[in-house]
């Protein structure tokens, strides 16, 4: 193999090209690659952190939702309990009012019965005196008439 000047010139040109590339071209490319690798690593770490944060947030939301459901159920239970208490109070008041109205009605009926009975006694006594006057054929004085009516009313 013959080494001639062209081959040596090409070797020197190639060596200069490699040196130039290693000195001026290669470092920016390596820096760009390393920067890109770090950006990708940061993005992956950030994505992983976001995924973990999303899972934590989801768990927190589920816990708050279940707590809200429990609280809502407690509120409903309390409302139902209060409703039942109010219904019981209203029923008791209605029963008291009913009993009072019935008692008042019985008292009114009893008073009316006594009034009618007394009125009937007085009419019967008056009729008895009128009948006795017709039978006797004479009129009794007013004081004696009232005395007889009072005695008849007391006996009836």
From Swiss-Prot:
InterPro entries: ATP_synth_B-like_membr_sf, ATP_synth_b/b'su_bac/chlpt, ATP_synth_F0_bsu_bac, ATP_synthase_B_chain. It is a single-pass membrane protein. Keywords: ATP synthesis, Cell inner membrane, Cell membrane, CF(0), Hydrogen ion transport, Ion transport, Membrane, Transmembrane, Transmembrane helix, Transport. The chain crosses the membrane at residues 11-31. The keyword DNA repair does not apply. F-type ATPases have 2 components, F(1) - the catalytic core - and F(0) - the membrane proton channel. F(1) has five subunits: alpha(3), beta(3), gamma(1), delta(1), epsilon(1). F(0) has three main subunits: a(1), b(2) and c(10-14). The alpha and beta chains form an alternating ring which encloses part of the gamma chain. F(1) is attached to F(0) by a central stalk formed by the gamma and epsilon chains, while a peripheral stalk is formed by the delta and b chains. This is ATP synthase subunit b. The gene is atpF.
């Amino acid at each position: 193999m013959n080494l001639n000047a062209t081959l040596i010139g090409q070797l020197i040109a190639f060596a200069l090209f490699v040196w130039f590339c290693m000195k001026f071209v290669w470092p920016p490319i390596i820096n760009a690659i390393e920067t890109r690798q770090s950006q990708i690593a940061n993005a992956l770490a950030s994505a992983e952190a976001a995924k973990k944060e999303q899972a934590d947030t989801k768990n927190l939301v589920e816990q708050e939702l279940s707590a809200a459901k429990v609280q809502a159920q407690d509120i409903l239970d309390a409302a139902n309990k209060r409703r039942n208490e109010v219904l019981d109070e209203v029923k008791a008041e209605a029963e008291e009012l009913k009993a009072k109205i019935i008692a008042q009605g019985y008292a009114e009926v009893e008073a009316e019965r006594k009034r009618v009975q007394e009125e009937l006694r007085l009419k019967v006594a008056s009729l008895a005196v009128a009948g006795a006057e017709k039978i006797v054929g004479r009129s009794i004085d007013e004081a004696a008439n009232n005395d007889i009516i009072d005695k008849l009313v007391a006996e009836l």
